[in-house]
Amino acid sequence: MKYIYLDNASTTFPKAPTVASAMSDYITNRGININRGSYALAYDVEDIIYTTRQRLNSLFNGHDPSHVFFTQNVTMSLNMVIKGLFKAGDHVLISSMEHNAVMRPLTQLLNEDITFDTIPCDTTGSIKLDAIESLIRPNTVAIIINHASNVCGTIQPVKEIGIICKEHNLHFIVDAAQTAGIMPIDVKESQIDALCFTGHKGLLGPQGIGGMILTKEMAQALTPLIAGGTGSFSHLETMPTNMPDAFESGTLNLPCIIGLNEGLAFIESKGMENIHNHELALTEAFLKGLRPIDGINIIGKQNVQDRTAVVSITIDGADAASVAYELESTYHIMTRVGLHCAPRAHQTLGTYPEGTVRFSFGYANTHKDVESALSALHKIVKNTKSVSYTHLR
């Protein structure tokens, strides 16, 4: 039985072709630690880890590979920045499209006299740029923005927001969970102080690895969330300040970093623009096929230029969870349903509390997958109308 995987916004599947073999080779043949052993095999693995930092720094046009830090995921990265930067009395601005990876740590900090206000977005998820300056207070220290919505794919204008941040001397923190490896991100051009990303989505690596790219100023301003052994300055009982050690305590997830390196190599070989154009072509075909179907509501932007390859829908008269269940059980199509860990985004989009059915395309999907999804939706809508008509009679 062939399944069609359309949940790439959750995690890309399949991964880049050499990810699994590279991870297996490391575990089987070179499964040693780095920054600990003074032997050749350790140095060989260190070279791979450094190459991965270089690739990430180049991809995002960061300031220095030493300021590329590995974490377990984007949620950890955001927590490290949010909980390491803000102090009592600070005020933060966020958008109304933020994920719980931002909302929950910020809500925890309310108990520490750290407050936040929400920059409104319209019903397509686009931030209202002209509303930002009126929300800035004397004690505002940062703006945190979800680069692209995991609910509807709407892309925010990070370059313009970065300009506003610099004009008001604010830190600019970007959640790039849905855009890293998918579309160009220029840390310098967009004046981003902290870019938080995950490795298992657009970067085509395994689950369990993420990271953050910091400016030198941001790295100096942060208090490390986790302290421990680094393999350097071991005579000190305080954390070293050299980078990247200051934010990488304990044993790194070396198998997953090596897998991420393979994902990055695949993106380099295929070309990120080529992968992105393929995914957007699938998205455009899907949107074109959805528009004539009476009863289907497309959430967010109506064109591909302003969105990622993520499409959320609702169906008149049909429960979202039931639609997703039928897609999987009858048509073997895997999607994501519900609130997507982003209730504020759904409130903004008008889809709270039920949520949506989300389709998200990846590099391995085909136009045949799109056709299968559209065919299934046609049948589901037809059946929904038939049931509704029978009920009315």
Regions found by a protein language model. Give the residues of each.
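Conserved small/polar residues in nucleotide/adenosyl-binding loops
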Residues: 390-393
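Pyridoxal 5′-phosphate
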Residues: 1-388
